[in-house]
Design a protein with these regions (language model features):
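Compact alpha/beta protein-protein interaction domains typified by the UBC
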Residues: 1-86, 130
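Charge-rich (especially acidic), low-complexity segments
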Residues: 75-131
């Protein structure tokens, strides 16, 4: 997923896992980030806080992913999993934004992932043509 524009996550490319529970769509899927990310509501291991407590079975997957993008740009106070990021967000927003950008450049650099995806696609095409 691309980072939301006009945020410090812009130009980042983030991988995450979506686990659909056995009682889906009546309960929200479980989401965890694979890409390292700096955010008050996301733990160091990628666990995301319960930002989907108002889940509705009518929510399609595309809307769910869009809500994740929106969530990145607007952290909330009630369930902070990264206390350092939460404290910085409240006390020094400029330093928080700079730290997010550092993480994006180091761990979610879009140009690096774009090149990796191109290599992967090329390898898949080559494997298919061998068969």
């Amino acid at each position: 997923m691309e980072g939301p524009i006009q945020t410090s996550y812009e130009n980042g490319f983030f991988f995450f896992k979506i686990k659909y529970r056995s009682n889906y769509p009546f309960r929200a899927p479980i989401l965890s980030f694979i890409t390292k990310i700096y955010h008050p509501n996301i733990s160091e291991n990628g666990t995301i806080s319960n930002c989907f407590k108002d889940w509705s079975p009518a929510v399609p997957t595309k809307a769910f992913i869009i809500s994740i993008q929106s969530f990145l740009g607007t952290p909330f106070d009630d369930e902070c999993l990264n206390t350092e990021a939460a404290k910085l967000y409240k006390e020094n927003r400029n330093l928080y934004e700079d730290t997010v950008k550092e993480y994006v450049n180091k761990y979610a650099n879009y140009s690096i992932y774009r090149n990796k995806l191109k290599e992967y696609e090329a390898e898949d095409i080559f494997k298919i043509s061998e068969n």
